[in-house]
A protein has these predicted regions:
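N-terminal auxiliary segments of SAM/dcSAM-dependent transferases
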Residues: 2-49
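Conserved SAM-binding loop and adjacent beta-strand
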Residues: 27-28, 43-50, 60-78, 82-83
Length: 121
């Protein structure tokens, strides 16, 4: 897969391209998961130094052994969980909160726990 970097492209379009190029090709992805990803811009959940590449198909390393998983892996995990809108979800080690934000569009309640304050700032 080839990605072309375009300066000043807005987050919504980058997010849409990520969904089309990385998540939809997985096949069988539930519509509600695609909608959840559409409503959360990945660049809102990464530090400034990672924003330029945050929509690429790779994990985003934050520090030490902490990172934000690549979007297609998050989508596979969330799909396997088969979360309903009546469920409460606990996310332990939520990092920057990106996956929690997506899950919040699917579940009744999401509680995120992160011990590293730097990742939340």
């Amino acid at each position: 897969m080839t990605f072309i970097y375009i300066e000043n492209m807005d987050s919504h379009l980058l997010n849409k391209n990520m969904i089309e190029g990385q998540i939809k090709p997985i096949g069988g992805m539930q519509k509600n998961i695609l909608q959840a990803f559409s409503s959360v811009n990945r660049d809102d959940f990464v530090p400034q130094n990672l924003k330029d590449n945050c929509y690429s198909e790779k994990n985003l390393f934050l520090k030490r052994d902490r990172f934000v998983l690549k979007a297609n892996l998050i989508a596979k995990i969330i799909s396997a969980l088969n979360i309903s809108n009546e469920e409460n979800v606990l996310v332990i080690g939520s990092s920057t909160g990106y996956s929690s934000a997506i899950i919040s569009r699917l579940a009744e309640t999401v509680i995120s726990i992160e011990e590293d304050q730097e990742l939340l700032d």
